[in-house]
Amino acid sequence: MTRIYEELFIVKPDASDEEVDAFVETLRTQLTAAGATVDKIDKWGKRRLAYRVDKYREGTYVLFQFTSEPTGVKELERRLRVSDIVLKFLTVRIDETLKRLDKRKKDRDKRAAKRAANAPASPAPAQPSLAQQMTEAPAAVPGGPMPGLPKEG
Protein backbone atom coordinates (compact mmCIF):
# COMPACT_ATOMS: atom_id res chain seq x y z
CA MET A 1 0.00 0.00 0.00
CA THR A 2 1.54 3.28 -1.08
CA ARG A 3 1.50 6.21 1.28
CA ILE A 4 2.54 9.85 1.11
CA TYR A 5 5.63 10.81 3.12
CA GLU A 6 7.70 13.89 3.86
CA GLU A 7 11.39 13.55 4.61
CA LEU A 8 13.24 16.53 6.04
CA PHE A 9 16.96 16.21 6.51
CA ILE A 10 19.74 18.58 7.52
CA VAL A 11 23.09 18.46 5.73
CA LYS A 12 26.33 19.69 7.30
CA PRO A 13 26.98 23.35 6.48
CA ASP A 14 30.51 22.70 5.22
CA ALA A 15 29.16 20.53 2.38
CA SER A 16 29.27 22.38 -0.95
CA ASP A 17 26.15 22.98 -3.03
CA GLU A 18 27.41 20.47 -5.60
CA GLU A 19 27.75 17.80 -2.90
CA VAL A 20 24.24 18.51 -1.63
CA ASP A 21 22.81 18.41 -5.17
CA ALA A 22 24.60 15.13 -5.92
CA PHE A 23 23.36 13.62 -2.65
CA VAL A 24 19.78 14.73 -3.33
CA GLU A 25 19.98 13.26 -6.83
CA THR A 26 21.23 9.89 -5.52
CA LEU A 27 18.39 9.81 -3.00
CA ARG A 28 15.87 10.65 -5.72
CA THR A 29 17.16 7.91 -8.02
CA GLN A 30 17.18 5.44 -5.11
CA LEU A 31 13.55 6.28 -4.35
CA THR A 32 12.43 5.95 -7.96
CA ALA A 33 14.32 2.65 -8.27
CA ALA A 34 12.37 1.40 -5.24
CA GLY A 35 9.10 2.22 -7.02
CA ALA A 36 8.40 5.55 -5.33
CA THR A 37 7.31 8.74 -7.04
CA VAL A 38 9.02 11.93 -5.88
CA ASP A 39 6.40 14.69 -5.81
CA LYS A 40 8.45 17.63 -4.57
CA ILE A 41 12.03 18.49 -3.57
CA ASP A 42 12.57 21.77 -1.70
CA LYS A 43 16.01 23.04 -0.77
CA TRP A 44 15.54 25.54 2.03
CA GLY A 45 19.20 26.53 2.16
CA LYS A 46 21.34 27.18 5.22
CA ARG A 47 19.48 27.92 8.42
CA ARG A 48 20.44 28.22 12.05
CA LEU A 49 19.75 25.11 14.15
CA ALA A 50 17.73 25.34 17.36
CA TYR A 51 20.57 23.62 19.23
CA ARG A 52 24.08 22.42 18.48
CA VAL A 53 24.31 19.12 16.57
CA ASP A 54 27.75 17.50 16.20
CA LYS A 55 29.44 20.86 16.88
CA TYR A 56 27.42 22.58 14.14
CA ARG A 57 25.14 25.58 14.73
CA GLU A 58 23.63 25.68 11.21
CA GLY A 59 22.81 23.30 8.41
CA THR A 60 21.33 23.04 4.93
CA TYR A 61 17.70 21.90 5.03
CA VAL A 62 16.22 19.70 2.28
CA LEU A 63 12.59 18.54 2.11
CA PHE A 64 11.37 15.58 0.04
CA GLN A 65 7.70 14.77 -0.52
CA PHE A 66 7.12 11.38 -2.10
CA THR A 67 4.71 8.47 -2.43
CA SER A 68 6.17 5.09 -1.58
CA GLU A 69 5.80 1.69 0.00
CA PRO A 70 7.05 1.39 3.61
CA THR A 71 10.04 -0.67 2.44
CA GLY A 72 11.26 2.23 0.28
CA VAL A 73 11.10 4.53 3.28
CA LYS A 74 13.14 2.12 5.39
CA GLU A 75 15.86 2.02 2.74
CA LEU A 76 15.89 5.83 2.47
CA GLU A 77 16.20 6.19 6.25
CA ARG A 78 19.02 3.64 6.29
CA ARG A 79 20.92 5.65 3.67
CA LEU A 80 20.40 8.89 5.59
CA ARG A 81 21.54 7.24 8.82
CA VAL A 82 24.85 5.98 7.36
CA SER A 83 25.57 9.12 5.32
CA ASP A 84 28.43 11.28 6.56
CA ILE A 85 26.98 14.60 5.47
CA VAL A 86 23.53 14.27 7.13
CA LEU A 87 23.19 15.70 10.64
CA LYS A 88 19.54 14.89 11.34
CA PHE A 89 16.49 13.61 9.48
CA LEU A 90 12.78 13.24 10.12
CA THR A 91 10.23 11.14 8.25
CA VAL A 92 6.53 11.96 8.53
CA ARG A 93 3.65 10.08 6.95
CA ILE A 94 1.28 12.81 5.81
CA ASP A 95 -1.49 10.80 4.16
CA GLU A 96 -3.12 10.22 7.57
CA THR A 97 -2.95 13.94 8.27
CA LEU A 98 -4.61 14.71 4.94
CA LYS A 99 -7.37 12.17 5.67
CA ARG A 100 -7.94 13.70 9.11
CA LEU A 101 -8.13 17.22 7.65
CA ASP A 102 -10.57 16.07 4.94
CA LYS A 103 -12.76 14.43 7.60
CA ARG A 104 -12.76 17.62 9.69
CA LYS A 105 -13.75 19.68 6.65
CA LYS A 106 -16.61 17.31 5.80
CA ASP A 107 -17.85 17.38 9.41
CA ARG A 108 -17.66 21.18 9.44
CA ASP A 109 -19.61 21.37 6.17
CA LYS A 110 -22.28 18.99 7.54
CA ARG A 111 -22.69 21.10 10.69
CA ALA A 112 -22.96 24.29 8.61
CA ALA A 113 -25.60 22.72 6.36
CA LYS A 114 -27.53 21.48 9.39
CA ARG A 115 -27.38 24.94 11.00
CA ALA A 116 -28.59 26.55 7.77
CA ALA A 117 -31.51 24.09 7.56
CA ASN A 118 -32.52 24.71 11.18
CA ALA A 119 -32.14 28.50 10.98
CA PRO A 120 -35.40 30.47 11.39
CA ALA A 121 -36.85 32.00 8.24
CA SER A 122 -37.23 35.45 9.80
CA PRO A 123 -34.20 37.29 11.12
CA ALA A 124 -33.68 37.32 14.88
CA PRO A 125 -34.77 40.48 16.74
CA ALA A 126 -31.97 42.99 16.87
CA GLN A 127 -30.30 43.58 20.20
CA PRO A 128 -30.36 47.22 21.33
CA SER A 129 -27.00 48.92 21.01
CA LEU A 130 -25.04 50.06 24.04
CA ALA A 131 -25.80 53.70 23.22
CA GLN A 132 -29.56 52.95 23.19
CA GLN A 133 -29.29 51.12 26.51
CA MET A 134 -27.45 54.07 28.06
CA THR A 135 -30.07 56.60 26.92
CA GLU A 136 -32.95 54.40 28.10
CA ALA A 137 -31.38 53.70 31.52
CA PRO A 138 -32.79 55.74 34.43
CA ALA A 139 -30.64 58.63 35.50
CA ALA A 140 -28.88 58.42 38.84
CA VAL A 141 -30.38 60.58 41.57
CA PRO A 142 -27.81 62.30 43.80
CA GLY A 143 -27.81 60.59 47.19
CA GLY A 144 -30.15 57.87 45.90
CA PRO A 145 -29.47 54.24 45.10
CA MET A 146 -27.44 53.39 42.03
CA PRO A 147 -29.52 52.08 39.14
CA GLY A 148 -29.14 48.37 38.56
CA LEU A 149 -28.13 47.53 42.15
CA PRO A 150 -30.51 45.67 44.47
CA LYS A 151 -32.27 47.82 47.03
CA GLU A 152 -31.14 47.53 50.61
CA GLY A 153 -33.78 46.37 52.87
Curated annotation (Swiss-Prot):
GO CC annotations on file: cytoplasm; ribonucleoprotein complex; ribosome
Name of the protein in its database record: Small ribosomal subunit protein bS6
Family: Belongs to the bacterial ribosomal protein bS6 family.
CDD domains from the UniProt entry: bS6 (cd00473)
GO molecular function: small ribosomal subunit rRNA binding; structural constituent of ribosome
The species this protein was found in: Solibacter usitatus (strain Ellin6076)
Record has Nucleotide-binding as a keyword: no
Compositional bias (Low complexity): 127-143
Keywords: Ribonucleoprotein, Ribosomal protein, RNA-binding, rRNA-binding
Role noted for this protein: Binds together with bS18 to 16S ribosomal RNA.
Cross-referenced NCBIfam families: S6
Biased composition (Basic residues): 101-114
UniProt keyword annotation of Ribosomal protein present: yes
Region entry Disordered, spans: 101-153
Biological process (GO), any one: translation
